[in-house]
Amino acid sequence: MTPTSLSTRDAGWIIFILALGAGFSVASIYYAQPLLPLMGANLHLTVEGMGLVPTLTQAGYALGILFLLPLGDRHDRRRLILVKSVLLALLLLLCSLTGQLSSLLVVSLLIGMAATMAQDIVPAAAILAPAGKQGKMVGTVMTGLLLGILLSRTVSGVVGAVFGWRVMYQAAAVSVALIGLVMWRVLPRFAVHSTLSYPQLMASMAHLWQRYPALRRAALAQGALSIAFSAFWSTLAVMLSEHYHMGSAVAGGFGIAGAPGRWPRRLPAVWPINLAPVR
């Protein structure tokens, strides 16, 4: 089966599977953030050591986007998604078994890199979508991805508080393994779009960076936002635990604070004018 053979009905439910895959994979980056005090107590970590866990996870994600995503143009995306899902599931399981900071940090870095599976899924959705429905299908997958980000901290905080942080990672490993298997079964093979070697692919990215100023501005802006966002979440759970004696469930509850961000899209266009401060 090839991507061009998908009917509108088939594409619809496959896109739904891809949305689940994007959500579960990207959630792997954020599970640790509410669990840091639990990890610290269990592994006897300092505050600095706890902060390095989400930092290296995010760094791994950035490295994966830079060095692994270009492979999607040269290799079958179905195979890449399978390989990354297997690696991600194994790394999540390994994280649940770790007993010292050094191994936890290495595994966290690799989890971030493998979680770029989510970014392989998004272009796959665009390729599979029937003509004229690319925007809707990609939007569905992006909704799954954003829900994974939004709900991951809340889920991990509650699960960690009730069952412990290791159980959360074991459950995450199972979820990624299952959705990876389903995607392997339902996805068609994807055509290779480039015959460039890996060094040539990387060089082409440098060319794009130099040629498009808008791309540079967008990348730098999003990078700065990501750093600020990660700095907040890398310290929130620790601060809540040390100063307010609040557990991981409360820290995870902050994860749903972004939900009201979708409300303004449903409000009348005149409301922002009425709500604007008078100067």
Regions found by a protein language model. Name each.
Residues 2-8, 187-219:
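Juxtamembrane intracellular "pre-TM" segments in multi-pass secondary transporters
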Residues 11-31, 109, 211-228:
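Pair of pore-lining "gating" transmembrane helices in MFS-fold secondary transporters
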Residues 13, 17-47, 65, 118, ...:
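Extracytoplasmic
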Residues 30, 58-66, 116, 149-150, ...:
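Residue-level signature of mid-helix packing/kink "hotspots" within the transmembrane helices
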Residues 63-101:
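Conserved MFS/SLC helix-loop-helix module at the cytosolic interface between two early adjacent transmembrane helices
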Residues 65-76, 264-277:
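Helix-to-loop junctions at the C-terminal end of transmembrane segments
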Residues 103, 140-187:
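Helix-loop-helix hairpin linking two adjacent transmembrane segments in secondary transporters
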Residues 107-144:
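Cytoplasmic helix-loop-helix junction between adjacent transmembrane helices
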